[in-house]
Amino acid sequence: ARKLKQLREAKGLSQRIVYIDTDFNIGKIEVGKTNITISTLSRLCNYYGTSLKEFFDELDQ
C-alpha cells in the first residue's frame, strides 16, 4: 500500500485522477482498507509506468 502511494506521488497524481483514469479506489488501497488482486496491481503498475518485477524488487530493498 505504501509503495503504491509513493508511485502515485512520484508521478504527481492525485487519488481522484487515478480513480478517474483507472476506476480503482486508490485511497482505500493505499491505506490497506481493501485487498487487491495481482491483476489490479499489475494494472496499477502499468499505469504508473513500472513493472510488477520492479515493484517487488524495490520492496525487497
Give the ranges of each region predicted by the language model.
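Surface-exposed alpha-helical interface segments used for non-catalytic interactions
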Residues: 2, 20, 42-43
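Short alpha-helical DNA-recognition segment
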Residues: 12-28
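DNA major-groove recognition helix of helix-turn-helix/homeodomain DNA-binding modules
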Residues: 39-54
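Base-recognition residues in the alpha-helical recognition helix of bacterial helix-turn-helix
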Residues: 28-31, 39, 57
